[in-house]
Amino acid sequence: MILLPAIDLMGGEVVRLRRGLATEKVVYSSDPVAFAKKWEDSGADWLHIVDLDAAFTGEPRNLDSVAKICAAVKIPCELGGGMRSEEKIQAAFDAGVARVILGTKACQSPETIAGFCAKFGGERIAVGIDANGGKVAVKGWTETTATVASDLALAAQKAGAGTIIYTDIATDGMLEGPNFAELEKMLSLLDCNLIASGGVSCDEDLKRLSLMPGLYGAIIGKALYDGRITGNLREIIAAA
């Protein structure tokens, strides 16, 4: 299982939101590169970067910071937030990211997933499925749709997306543990890579995730920033 520390960017700063609410924002740093290097040194396999300004508005606002992060680390980076057109996806790749994450666009126009996969390669396309009570939320989680999360996951896999990132909104930033039941359901449905996001609170959560058969990766956010998980990430899951 690969480990992906999260770097959420807003106005060029590293922030964390509780349940995706902009009103519940904590600013951790004005130096994203320093955190990127810190997580790389801690044993991260990838970095999971989200442009929150773009997620809320649809317009990328933090590509300069993203490019600096990609240039500063040796591990690959993925980027989500505002990836709603070929031009914006290409700009992300030009900034140095290895994989982009489709969210709102994938839900609102699932037929576009296959086109993006054909143009850029399915291994470079992830679909982020942010679930609120089993339904997909979009536009920075400000709107919950009627789309069933598992249906979108299957459609994305069929369209050629190499990776699905499943976020349980109710657990995100709450430090109460991942939604293991929903992850098991997703794993039973999918053959492509599945990354778990939301709720990781301690070493034991990481160990339990690492023991889930077929789980490709786990994103870690608030638990790292708040010091609930310390030490080398690889060593933590090796001890599982």
Whereabouts are the PLM-identified features?
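Glycine-rich, proline-tolerant flexible connector loops at the mouths of alpha/beta enzymes
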Residues: 46-64, 104, 166-176
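Conserved, mostly hydrophobic/aromatic
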Residues: 8, 39, 47, 79, ...
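Catalytic cores of alpha/beta
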Residues: 73-99, 181-218
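Conserved anion-binding
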Residues: 11-12, 19-23, 90-93, 97-172
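C-terminal helical cap(s) of enzyme catalytic domains, especially alpha/beta-barrels
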Residues: 111-120, 187, 206, 210-240
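Short, acidic/polar
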Residues: 28-40, 84-90, 145-155, 206
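Charged helix-capping and loop-helix junction motifs
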Residues: 60-67, 142-151, 176-184, 233-237
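Structural preference for beta-strand elements that scaffold enzyme active sites
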Residues: 2-6, 46, 74-78, 98-101, ...
